[in-house]
Amino acid sequence: MPSGEARIEALFTPEDDAIGNIVAAVGKARHDIRVQAYLFTSRKLANALIRARHAGVDVQVIVDQEQLEKGGVSVAAELAAGHVPIYLDGDHNNAHNKIILIDAASDTPVVITGSYNFTVAAQTRNAENVLIIRNWKSLAAAYRDNWDNHRKHSRPMQ
């Protein structure tokens, strides 16, 4: 159960500015950001992650290996050039998670999840949903444990 301080914001595209809210949350990170993505072509989000990395935040990204090979993770080179470690999850038919964890072990964790792939189409053309869940420590810990488990079987992008 969430603590009394937990806040949940629901966003629906294309009406709501999901990417703006996601980028704003990323910009407030202080310690670490963990991303798990199926499709990732949003330069706005990639640039926000690179800015966070340059500000000293520990940023790491897991992407679906097959989607990377098919071009569905077109920002991978930019992230790598920005010194953001990228890991390839090829152990599943689809590594279909779409999550961002911000300061997951802190007193003010943020979990971002939903149907929303990190793409321009998800914001402008698709009917998608995004939940931004703040201050729910046990949920953030569960998502972080899951992220860590996927990281264990993922390989670094070369």
Regions found by a protein language model. Give the residues of each.
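Short, flexible loop segments at the rims of nucleotide/cofactor-binding pockets, characterized by
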Residues: 9-14, 35-38
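Active-site beta-strand/loop signature of hydrolases that rely on acidic residues for catalysis
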Residues: 33-37, 60-63
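Secondary-structure "cap/kink" motif recognition
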Residues: 18-32
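PLD/PLD-like phosphodiesterase catalytic module centered on the HKD motif
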Residues: 1-6, 10, 18-19, 44-158
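Structural motif
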Residues: 31-34, 110
